[in-house]
Amino acid sequence: MDIQHGPYQQVRRPIRNRMRNLDELKLRQIADGGDHKPPSSELVTEFESAFDIVLPTDYIALLMYSNGGYPELDSVIPIGMNESGRLSINRFYRLDENRCDTEGLWRVMKVWKPILGHGLLPVASDGGGNQFVLDLRANACGVYFCIHDEKFILQHVADSFGKLIDSLHINPDFI
């Protein structure tokens, strides 16, 4: 699916390999009275246009499945790290009409785009305010962990959003 954005044309990145069944993540929502239904294709397009990005299909699959949430399988070991470098996802952000929701992509992008720059999209956070970020810049891809206490350095976590999902597991410290 070709999408025209800005002065250049981008192509939606396909799912390279089928990622795991999203039921396995055991995503749950907080009973906050919010509407957690999947975003419409029009809303996805509006969000992409507002930030001049193209969301990868594997990330859209998560939005359509649960539109964010808190995963039970929340632990990931970044590329090149060992068990001691394990990271945990507290929540995936949702995409809905509410532009002020602190768990929503609109607000998260408003806060983080000036820090991260164009083409980097926070999709999840840990419990301490650090962000799991999709790199959507041209000729780039992957998921990074933005460590705000260390001058916002980006640590490579996975080569794609699907690979991040595939690598999530239950933190053995909580079993």
What are these regions (language model features)?
Residues 153-173:
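Compact, glycine/acidic-enriched structural inserts
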